[in-house]
């Protein structure tokens, strides 16, 4: 997948004047083509060039960064999140409003997260790989970067759509599964796997 370049970034004033339109379009795109919910408190947002373009534009808008060298440094960081061929890259997001741990509602904590906790279930189980693996990454905030490496067989299952595909997360007493991935989302992920 092509990396973001400085020429792709709108000047701050241009982006600001169209931000509402971009934001609404971005949210619709995420919800329909890029987001998977696991229960009520966890989401996966699969990143690609389009999602990261908006994210970077927002960072530049909020920080008022306009220096091309600084902008390029930011692009270099975010370009690492653009998936390579045969890879799905996602943000793993834990809702900060998640209710506290109770016996009937075991809470999930990022401190308990390991790559094999989260799996893509096709006709086989594919564990995720943590992009952020340091202990301090796992103890801060409500988000992680993860990726899935798919072989040709798994890619064809995503494309074909006849075999169910979903995500499953288990840790200690916590278990959450997504619904079967809808066609639009599978097609969007298939595009990621080709680039």
Can you say where each PLM-predicted feature lies in the sequence?
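Long, contiguous binding/interaction regions
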Residues: 1-89, 96-195
